[in-house]
Amino acid sequence: MSNAVSIRKCEISDVEILVKMRLEFLKEAGYVKDTTNVQELIQELEEYIRSHVNKDLFFWVAEIDTVAVSTGVLMFWDKLPICAGKQNGSKVGYVSNMYTIPKFRRKGIASNIVKEIIKYGKNLGMLKIMLHASEDGKGVYKNLGFTTNESFMEIKL
């Protein structure tokens, strides 16, 4: 077994991998506590990913010997124009679902996925990329140049 990590942008054929990694993320975060509705969740995830992959959601996977060890997602939206010129209709990105299997953490894998996401966002002409960081992930993002923005407010509906 080699330790070489390869990172690639996912295609629709990767749905099974993406669903598996999303389930691991949800279990670890405490959202999936039992197996009662797991099959239904798997079906919903498959449908959602198939309808959004490489349209408004872009997924990356890091693999070692073709085994997925980390994933990340970039979603985006077009920002409403605020003035004439450069920012008119520019895209804003949001990184979500960064997940690395525990035994592969602290090896720079997630950082490398985020670097690929940033590069892709730049190529799409994004104004900025945002995210909500876990405590464990804050260092990763700060080291890559992300800054804290405390201007967000939200209401849960």
Predicted regions and their residues:
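Conserved GNAT acetyl-CoA-binding A-motif
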Residues: 114, 121-133
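Conserved GNAT-fold acetyl-CoA-binding loop/helix
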Residues: 26-48
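Conserved active-site tyrosine of GNAT-family acetyltransferases
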Residues: 141, 146
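Conserved acetyl-CoA pyrophosphate-binding loop and the N-cap/start of the following alpha-helix
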Residues: 104-116
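A short beta-loop-alpha structural element at the N-terminal edge
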Residues: 6-20
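Conserved beta-strand in the GNAT
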Residues: 61, 67-76, 94, 99
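Conserved beta-strand-loop-alpha-helix junction that forms the acyl-donor binding cleft
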Residues: 129-139, 154-157
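A short helix-loop-beta-strand connector motif used in the catalytic cores of GNAT acetyltransferases and
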Residues: 47-61
